[in-house]
Amino acid sequence: MANSLILGSPINPEGEMMIQFSNNHDNNIEFQRRKKMKKNNPETETDSSSDLSCFVAQTGALLHLPQGFTSSNGSNRECRKSPRPIISSYSSSEKQFVTFTLAPVDGRHCRLRLPMQFTRENGINKPGKIYLVGKDGSKWLANLLLENNRGRMTLGDGWKSFVKANGLKTGDTYTFKLLWEDTTPVLSLCFEEYNTDTRVGEESSKESLPAEPSSQEKIVKDDNNKDESSTWKREGNHLRCKDSTSPSQNCTLTVTITPDSLEHGRLRLPLQFMTENSMNKPGEITLLGTDGAKWMASLLLEKKGRMSLGKGWKDFAKANGLKTGDSITLEPIWEDRTPVLSIKSSSGKGQSEFSKESLSIKPSSGNMTKKVENNREASRKYPPRSRESSSAIQNQFMALTPLRDIVSQVAHDLSIGEVINFRHKGDNMLRVSDLGSNCCGVQDLLAPSSNYDHDNISNISMKINPHIRKEAVTFSSYDGYAHDNFEPPSKKKVKKNNPEMEADYLSDHSCFVSHVTTSSLHTNALSLEVKESLPIEPSIKPNISEDDNNKEEDIIEENSSFEREKNHWICIDSISSSQNRFLTLTITPDSLKHGRLRLPLQFMIENSMNKPGEITVLGKDGAKWLVSLLLERRGRMSLDASSGQETREAEKNREESSSLWELEKRTYCPRKRDSSSDVKNRFLTLTLAPEDVKDGNLHLPCQFMRINGINKPGQITLLGRGGMKWFAYLLSGDGTVVVGNGWKGFCEANGVMLGETFVLEFIPKDDTNHVFKFYTK
């Protein structure tokens, strides 16, 4: 029969619940084994039930605690298993840091697994080498391996040596910081005082704290309703002001440039940052550089829900001098409904220094982007003209190749067909103007129509306001002067052949017109016209009187000479063709084996040789060879050497050929010979080598084969003493002859031993069988 026990639960000062065993007598604390217990005493049960700190239980194999007892004393927590120890942790807010707890397996197997989220967001997805930097700054080279099963990156050889050298112990927690050296990742061990628990503590502080044990049981329902209603109002107000508060709380984002982001043109952005700033929808986004220039980029949504910058990001990074390993701080800005990411600061070796005098564009104005795009679209409407050659004007041009740091400051985004204006400012400085406020007059030509040839393409010439400040060169579309008074040019009818306008325009030597061509963009060089009346010297500056300035400000001309513009086009094309006349190629084994020489398509297009047909190749000795020019499937051009023949007519008229290719270097092959040279070139001296006898081969020099016109494989005849004949086979044009077995006996029969020399005389025959006479020296 089960006994009844009264259990009490006093709480100790430490907050732990203690269970005391007691019978009905208050003085007897110890349990008496052979003492009979009172059965079913209703008074005792009533007294104990009124006191919530004790209860009556039946003694059995298991002791069950009443639910009311546990809930009233705050002991209603469930018992759970202890959580698994964290081996590695990673926080997306600081993706440069990763925390490891060194496990015994890591040291035993000499491997350390990296978190997949850490490697993906930092672009570490390829096996290779990685540097490990210790506390003292020493570097250790380790292998970065890729597991085939799950795509996880691990540290291989070199990790165990790093652990021993830095005294890392099993069970301790260490934090590493990711750095980059060019394209090689670097994991730097942080000092002991750097505690990553501060980052984890912020996240854990968001969790609700457990309620302290309380002895209160009664809670008024009205108070609960009031709390719930106040909570609902507070949540509603939070949702209303979420859009206004989130940008201020998450106003900046620090991103590290990885090699993959520049190679593939993708920059991944944290989804939490983009969501809180309402930029989590794909579309277009504006990137604002440190110089104020705006770049349009694509905002993409990847399969896993992450946001990334796509097309336009790579050009933006190059223009702002961003390199691998640089850290940039981005600030989200909204212009109407267009999202904008502005670079607040950048740090690293790739940081570029921009000019202090470059004018910045306000984020609220999009005039620059719109006007440049309109000019670009208008210029693309006109087809490119055909090239004409004019060698007499080639010396009137010079090539200007801007430096890389200057090009990065240009915000014009020039394209083929656009017109830019330069001004000489003294000290060899040139100024770019793209329909800016410095232009006091714009002159247009008629657009191409059916009555005109493609040579009459519309061109835009600009005249510079003489009141331009004399400062350092700046590349910008706006100079800040009279911006409100400037109006874009309108299309008006043009009067032809206005001599007054020509004289006025040509008299101002401080400006000229240049046209952007295909070759100028490919070669990164722009051809500028140099007139004799404008010597560029550091000491010369344009002297313009006040009367001339007033006249130029008041007069706005709209006409231009059609013939002068046509001659300008001819000059531009002649200099571009002279710049791309040379091509350097490397002879590959495949080109000689298959008889095909591939030529760059860009070079062929710029020289108008992109159509299949025949082409003449001019040798160094003046000999001309007719070769087939082929067009492959992928659009590449190639030379077919199998059809190359020497043309007699081309040899007579060397200067009349339309397309000639001159070879700078080739083997000497005389084509015009007298009788004495003919006889001399028919003899060949060779040495009988052991390997030739063993392999049964005979190698004839390539030059000897070419001079005597032996270019076809077939059977040849060797004539020895007393009319002895030996038949051999010529395999290819490189001079390899298979003489077969018995070649040693043939040489000994003619008095030639191993290591001795002999002479072969080529006897020309009308038939295809070549004959060589064998002599001893």
From Swiss-Prot:
It comes from Arabidopsis thaliana. This is B3 domain-containing protein REM-like 1. SUPFAM superfamilies: DNA-binding pseudobarrel domain (SSF101936). CDD domains: B3_DNA. Disulfide bonds: none annotated. It holds the Pfam family B3. GO terms for cellular component: nucleus. InterPro entries: B3_DNA-bd, DNA-bd_pseudobarrel_sf, REM_fam.
